[in-house]
Swiss-Prot record:
One of its GO terms (cellular component) is nucleus. It comes from the Eukaryota. The lineage of its organism: Eukaryota, Viridiplantae, Streptophyta, Embryophyta, Tracheophyta. Its main location: nucleus. Probably acts as a transcriptional activator. Binds to the GCC-box pathogenesis-related promoter element. May be involved in the regulation of gene expression by stress factors and by components of stress signal transduction pathways. Pfam families: AP2. InterPro entries: AP2/ERF_dom, AP2/ERF_dom_sf, AP2/ERF_ERF_subfamily, DNA-bd_dom_sf. This is Ethylene-responsive transcription factor ERF003.
Length: 181
């Protein structure tokens, strides 16, 4: 029977014994690989460092954090590239949260003005446009991530039509018995 081991958030053990760590961001729907480590504790500390970089002080970590502690060599488990990537995720999530807050405020203002006009909030919600565009601007401005659902759907339909046209000949036959008059 295997010896019970303490489980850490964002850490798992490979079948040959090494420990790996990764972190996921729930808002951005991203997963970032943090690396392979010799011990579960090192992997958990790397996760904690990444969580603080990606989510700020509100991050859920494996170990308590003391900002006044003297940094040791084990506290630098993440590379500079990985640290920069995590910081970009943090900035993108801040911007996404800020956009969500402004959208909520404008929706609240619209529903209040609609209520004062005698229209219910549900009716004003239904009358608004169906497509919404979410845009995340990275700090350095290199990448813009846009989600626009209507054009994507039209592209998908167009692709399906092209596949049907180029698929080859299709023979259609009737499954109903023919009636004689």
């Amino acid at each position: 029977m295997a010896r019970p081991q303490q489980r850490f958030r964002g850490v798992r053990q490979r079948h040959w014994g090494s420990w790996v760590s990764e972190i996921r961001h729930p808002l951005l729907k991203t997963r970032i690989w943090l690396g392979t480590f010799e011990t579960a504790e090192d992997a958990a500390r790397a996760y904690d460092e990444a969580a603080r970089l990606m989510c700020g002080p509100r991050a859920r970590t494996n170990f308590p954090y003391n900002p006044n502690a003297i940094p040791t060599s084990s506290s630098k488990l993440l590379s500079a590239t990985l640290t920069a990537k995590l910081h970009k995720c943090y900035m993108a999530s801040l911007q996404m949260t800020k956009q969500t807050q402004t959208q909520t405020q404008t929706q609240t203002a619209r529903s209040q003005s609609a209520d004062s006009d005698g229209v219910t909030a549900n009716e004003s919600h239904l009358n608004r446009g169906v497509t919404e565009t979410t845009e995340i601007k990275w700090e350095d401005g290199n990448a813009n991530m846009q989600q626009n659902f209507r054009p994507l759907e039209e592209d998908h339909i167009e692709q399906m039509i092209e596949e049907l046209l180029h698929y080859g000949s299709i023979e259609l036959c009737s499954v109903l018995p023919t009636q004689t008059l």
